[in-house]
Amino acid sequence: MNLNRRDFSRLSAMAAMATALPRVDAQNDENAAGRKLRWGIVGLGRISMDHFMPAVAASKTGKLTALVSGHREKAEKQAAMYNVPSPSIYSYETYDEIAQNKEIDGVYIALPNSMHAEYTIRAAKAGKHVLCEKPMATSVADSKAMIDM
């Protein structure tokens, strides 16, 4: 793989986040020791497929457990690669059903910038932790709404 400096920096930051978050959880929960953080990936574009998903799969502290995509076939292909069960593949229309999926601890939002606020807020309402790509939102109002969740 031929990486430029920008891609290397992004991949390094995401890998660090993917491995650090479960340690924070484990420090606060005696029952979490040795448990992997279970990720739902929202958006199957280049950033998530080329960087975040491989980093989580390679980590000792993370596991991919759900996918959200507007393209079912693409999601099924990725699910097969990462052993994500078919019932844990969601469309944008069925996204709110993640609330019932106890195999998702948090979601990684890798959607177009204009969609960050909506899907972050919906995940928070579903009781899921959120890691959102940058920029957080496209307006101050959206950012505030995300923070206030």
How should these model regions be labeled?
Residues 1-15:
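N-terminal secretory signal peptides and thylakoid transit peptides that target proteins
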Residues 55-59, 78-81, 122-126, 145-149:
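Alpha-helical structural signal in soluble globular domains
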Residues 11-83:
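N-terminal Rossmann-like dinucleotide-binding module
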